[in-house]
Each structure stands twice: as C-alpha cells, then as structure tokens.
Amino acid sequence: MAEMMGGITGWFVADKIVAYLFIVLFIWGASNKFGKKGEFNDDFTSLDNMKSLQGFAALGVILHHISQEYFFQEEGVLSLFVNAGAYFVALFFFCSGYGLIKSLDTKKDYLKGFIGKRVVKSLVIPFYVNVILYGLMMFIVKWPLEPLQWVTNFLGITMMNRYAWFPIVLAILYVVFYLHFSNIKNRKICFVAIGIFIICLGIHTCICGHVAWWAGPDNWWMDDNFWETDFKWWMDEQIFWFNGEWWANSAPAFLTGLIFANYEKKIVAFFKKKYALKLHILIVITLLLGMLNNYGQAEFGYWTEWEGNGPAIGDKIVTYFTQIPLLFVFPLLVFVIMMKYHVSNPVSRFFGKYSLHTYLMNLAAITMCRFIEVPDALVMVGDVKNNLFIFAIAVIVLSVLLGMLEHKITTAVQNLIYRKPAPVAVATYVRPSLLEADGEHTTKTSLAAEIKSDDVADKKAEEKKDRS
C-alpha cells in the first residue's frame, strides 16, 4: 500500500481537485435529458447557453495559459489544461460562425453596415483599447522596447499583447464572411471558399513559424552568439502576426459553426433519430481524429525550429493537416451532447459576459503575478508549490478585475464613437382615429361638439330676432 501511495503527493491530489472543480462547473445548473428517451433540450443553442459555453471556454483559456508557465509544467500542476487551449478557442470560433448565419437569416439587412458594427466596433476597437492599456502598463514599469517597436506595437503591426491574436483572426474571418455572403448567393460555394481560405491561413502560419527564421543564417535562433551580436527585436518569437500555429489551428471550427447554423434543423433531426447510437459513433470518430492529431504532433510537430533542421515548414504543414479534422468535428460533438445536456450557472454566465476582455487581459495578470511564481524572487509566499497555487488564484482574480475594467473602458469608447444623435423633438398634431380615441379624447371632443352646437343655436336665435 505504501508503495502504491509513494508516487502520490499533496500537489498530485490538488491538481486532480482543480480538475474536479472545473468538472463540477459542468454539473451546476445543468439541464439533463440523458436517460429520457425522445426528450431533448430545445434551447441548447439559445443565446444564454452560447454565452455560458463561451464562459467555460474563457475560464479554460485562462487555466491553459497558467498551466503553460514554466514552473507549472515542471511540477505537473494543471496538466489537464496544457494542451487544451485549441479546444477552448475552437468553441469561440464555432459560436462566432453560428451567430453570423443566424443573424443573417433573422435580421433584416444584416450585412448593411456589417463592417462598422461587427468588425470595427466589436473587434477593432477592443483590440486597440487593449493595445493602449498594455502600452501604458509597459511605459509605467519601464518595459524595455525599441522606439520603432513602440510605434509598430501601437499601430498593431507587431504585437503589444501576444495573446491578442484572437480578435485579429476573428476580424479577418468576419471580413471574409462579409465579402462572400454579400456577393455570392449560393451558400455552398461560400462555405467551400471560406474553408479554403481557413486552410490557407493555417498554411501561412506554418510558413511564418515562431521566429523570423528568414532574417539570418540557417538556424540562427539556436546560436547564442548570434543572439548577443546580431539579434534584432523583430526577429524574436511571436512578434509579427501569425507567428504561431495557434493563430489558425482552431479556425476550422468557425466553418463548422457556419455549416451547423445553416443546416441546424436537418442536423438536429438526424441526430434525434437513434441519438445514443449516433452520439457514440461521433465520440469514436472524435477519438480517432484525436489519435491522428497526437500522431501528427509526435511525429512531425509545430516547434520544428529547435530540431536544428531550419524552419521545417513541411513538418508543420503535415501537423496542421492532421489537426484540422479534429478541430472541425470537436465543436459538433459538444453541441450534439448539448442537445441532451447543457449547463448555465452564474460562473459561466459571468465569464461569458466578459470572455473577450478577461482573455485579453490575461497576459497582463500573469506578468504582474510572476513575482509569486518564481521561487528565488524577492517576495516569497512559501515553497514553490504553495506559490503556484496562490499564483493561479491571483491570476484568475486579476484577469477578471482587469477584464471588467477593460470592458468598461471599451464600452465607453464604443458609445463615444457610435453614439446616436439625440432625436429632434417635432411638435405635430396627429388626428387619432375613432378606434384609437381614449376616454379623455372622447370627452373633449364631445364637450367641443356641445359648445359648437350651443354657439350655432345662439347665432340662429339672434338672426331670427333681427328679422323680426
């Protein structure tokens, strides 16, 4: 027994407890139709449930970013979330694609003013508000940036916040959606064209790699001497757009959302017949695609620059193509499950409301809290693992607070730019119909009729008197 328990530490248990608590969130406020034959959740794609799902995804992304910190990986804490980021982001992309088609089908002239409302107001303004906030924080703490980098960061050409890639990619996909659906009537052609664009976007990230591999001699990023003598700031990791596979590897889910929304009735009707059998088949397919993805990651991989064979773009592209099917199908599996089981609780709704902003401010929170994480820092809370626990809690809380602040600032900027002109008051008289007349109006008109009748009678009496 002692030997069996020898590998189990307090932090092993704590790690599992964190995973358990995250799972508990999927039970609290659940609507469960499993075990009830022929019964389904008719509201599984409602706005409230979509927002709750995005809330879970936002919290998952925060935990994913925390789990990727060096000491967390060393200690194996939050290991469940290390490679889960792409799945959480895929849910965001799916919901975005789904919402576009539903809005297109239900809102009159939806594409009129689309770029201004859905791209500039909803994505570009939040992005640049975030750029300014990060710039102010970097200026306050005297973050060492080259003068040119300050300029390119504020312009958005290079990344002030390396986590802020999502609104950029989503804005690009929105523009692509608008260009296709405003000019092409055949939706199938639109879906195919958007799918091709998404694949090309992923290939482009594979070509870009993680560093400016094209800017120096072969494998310069592995040469310590080059870093000390010839390295320029713009050659570093994640400086330019698309420096990283995460920019596009989850984007196929956007296409899934478009297609699901367009054929929702047919898809739902299909899965309602023999639901249990089809759900299990879909689960098996997803697991097989997961194995294909794992094979691609293990045999080829995205981080090929550090194998000493140059950027190895071909290996990246192969890895990308082994991942596309999984991230296309995974959101479908989630929503087929939601036909029978979905969750909405205060935590999920809260994170759903602030999902974009907690995500955008997450890097700032992580950076501010790193003094807790590093064991040889001046400020010590306890041993390394105690520090990691406090670090994780602090990052979540600070991400929420900073996200709420950014949301408030962004909303104020949006209202300032897009405020509607005050309505001009025009005094007009509208003659109500008899059916619209209320009691007061009826009384007034009756009284006026009586006064007018009396006046006519008096006038006739006076005329009669004059004649006589």
For the regions a language model picked out, list residue spans one by one.
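Membrane-interfacial loop-to-transmembrane-helix junctions in polytopic alpha-helical membrane proteins
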Residues: G7, D42-N49, E74-F81, W234-G244, ...
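Aromatic-enriched alpha-helical transmembrane segments of multi-pass intramembrane proteins
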Residues: I8-F12, K16-V18, F154-N161, F181-D315, ...
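Alpha-helical transmembrane segments of multi-pass integral membrane proteins
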Residues: W11-I23, T286-Q414
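Short glycine/serine/threonine-biased micro-segments
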Residues: C95, L255, F350
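Soluble or luminal CAZymes and related metallo-dependent hydrolases
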Residues: L111, P167, A171-I172, A248, ...
